[in-house]
Amino acid sequence: MRIISRSSGYASALLLAGTAALAAPAAAQASAALPGPPVVPCSSSALVAAIQQANGARFATLLLTRGCNYVLTVAAPDDGLPPITGNLVIIGSGGTTISRSSSAGNFRIFDVAGGRLALVNVTVANGNSGNQVGGGILDEGTLVLRGVRLTGNTAPSGAGLDVQNDAHATISFSELDGNNATGLAGGAIDNSADLVVDHSRVIANTAHSFGGGVFTLDPGTSRITTTVVARNVAGRTGGGIFNTTGATTVLIGDRVVFNSAGSGGGIFNGGTVQLRFTLVAFNSPDNCSPQGTIRGCLR
C-alpha cells in the first residue's frame, strides 16, 4: 500500500524526513551504523509513554510491535492515547492493532490536536467517544492514513473519523468498515474541513440519520477517488454519501453501490456533488436525491 497526502509527496517527505532525522549517525563516519526508530513494546502503557515523549520532539517515528494488539483500558480524559500535538509517524506491521478494551469506559483512540500524524499499517478498533464526535480518530490538525483499517468504532457523529476545524485528512489504500454513528451523521467519516480518500473501501457503516458512509458538512470539501462506497446504511438520507448545503463532494472513478436510506440511498445532495467516471447504482430506494441535483446520476 502507498500513502499520499493532499499535497503531492507530503507524506513521503514526512516519512523520509523523520527517518533521516532519527537515523542521523553520532559521528560523521561512513562506516558508522545508523540507529533506526524505536520499537514500542507490546504494551498500551509503553505506547502512551512513547507518544508523550514524541510530542516533545521536533519529529518522531514510532515502530509498533509486529502483530501486537495495544489494548487501551483508560482515557485521559476523552482519548485512549495522548493528543497528538507534535509531528509523528506511527508504523505497524503484521496486523498491528490499537483498540479500546470492551470492558473500558468510553473514549476515542486518537485525537490529532493541532499536530501532524501519519498512521501506517495499523487497525484502529472499538473506539467509543460517548457523547463526543470521532469514535476512532478526531482530526483537528493534519492526518495521513495509509494501509489503515478503522473498524467497529462508535460516536454520535464521525464514528470512524471526524475531520473539523480547518483540519486536513488524507486516506489511501485503507478500509473503513463496521463503524456506527449513533446520533446524527457520518458512519465512517464526518468531514467539515478538507478530506481526500483514494484507493480505499468504505463498507458496511451505519448512521442513525445522515450519511451512512461519508457525511460532508459546510464548509467541508471531500475528494473521493478510485474508492468503493458500498453497503452503508443511513436511517434517514444519504446511505452512501450525504453532502450538505455549502459543502462540496467530488467523486472520480468510484463505485457507490448497494447502499440504503430513506431517500438518497446512494447520495443525498444539498450542495455541490460532481461525478466523474463514477458508478452510482443498485442503491435503495434510489441512487441520488433530490432528483436532478447531481448531473449524470440516474435516479
Residue ranges and their predicted role:
Residues 60, 86-88, 96, 108, ...:
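The right-handed parallel beta-helix/beta-solenoid scaffold, focusing on the short coil/turn
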Residues 52, 73-89, 99-120, 125-143, ...:
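Extracellular beta-strand-rich solenoid/capping regions of secreted or surface-exposed proteins
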Residues 41-43, 49, 55, 67-69, ...:
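Sequence contexts marking disulfide-bonded cysteines in secreted/extracellular proteins
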Residues 94-96, 118-126, 142-154, 168-180, ...:
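Right-handed parallel beta-helix
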Residues 1-32:
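Secretory targeting and sorting signals
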Residues 42-45, 59-87, 96:
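N-terminal extracellular ligand-recognition/capping segment immediately after the signal peptide
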